[in-house]
Amino acid sequence: MRSIKSRALVAVLAGGCALGLAQVVGAPATERSLTKKEILDLYEGKSWFWEKGIAFFAAKGQFNAFSEEGNERSTVAGDWEALDDGRMCFSGVWTAKSWRRFARTCFVHKIKDGQIYQRRTPKGDWYIFRHEPSQEGDQKLVPGDQTK
């Protein structure tokens, strides 16, 4: 039972972390994928504030994060990468008081008219990651490591 619960929690922490208050939308018909450089510019050296945690995307592909579900806190130290097909992936061993699990999570990014769309792969819903111009409710990426 604990194993099933911990796997479900990892899925929530590693994958369901991004949506927050974002509105689910369909991807635009004439979008293009973000390039590796655009993804690096978007994430590298920044902390991403999730609904229940924070992740930091360091230079040279290092990744660390924490998340809290109920009264249980989990942490991860691992790797992240930007790919030319618009994907950003992070992976590592999530650890909490009662469990440890490896997870790899990927998001794909598209852009149209400066507006960035994102979805978790392979089956997530598209949502607006960042409006053009920025709006309240856009995903929060802040310079520096805010996980400490």
Language model region names:
Residues 21-79, 83-148:
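Lipid interaction determinants
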Residues 2-12:
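Bacterial N-terminal signal peptides that target proteins for export
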Residues 10-20:
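Bacterial N-terminal signal peptides
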